[in-house]
């Protein structure tokens, strides 16, 4: 069994026990003990107010993945803490999210909130760089813009649990623009140039040419590139 099994299942107690039995984890083990066994949370290179917010997310991760608190209860505790910190105790979640955005953006950071694979976790980064690629497709060359996201401070729960070993590589905006986290990609690799870029560019071309196209047809056509 590999340690990734524990992370994918959100089993930090199991991961720590595994690390204690395997010499190759001796350097990283103290960091896990500090956070999850001792509740000594990480501080990030951001203003104190933002660190206070990120600390609440870290407590949520410890509650959920180490202490065994049901996610719904941990989430309720997280949201209550955020509302108290931002002095908006009766706010709906949508309004709370807007306020969180504003707080981070006021300090010069980009932010995305919500859940990834069932768990809360913010994405906080410093710079968005729109980059235009010329993509060769079966029907000709198409321009496709990708947002390269740089200078990540926080990359949601899987990145946090694994100290960056695993984590989200990016996401699509509502308008179809792909956002790629710089540290997650080799931008000269086949994984990026073919598996992601050509695939998504073909989707964009097809949606413009065939407005009524089904998701199944989109995927079929993208597999042909």
Map each language-model feature to its residues:
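N-terminal low-structure segments adjacent to metalloprotease catalytic domains
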Residues: 1-110
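Post-HExxH zinc-binding segment in Zn-dependent metallohydrolases
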Residues: 15, 20, 24, 214-225
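Ordered hydrophobic segments in well-structured contexts
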Residues: 79, 122-123, 179-181, 224
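Short, flexible loop/turn elements at secondary-structure junctions
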Residues: 129, 182-184, 202, 209-210
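Active-site recognition of the HExxH zinc-binding catalytic motif
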Residues: 194-208
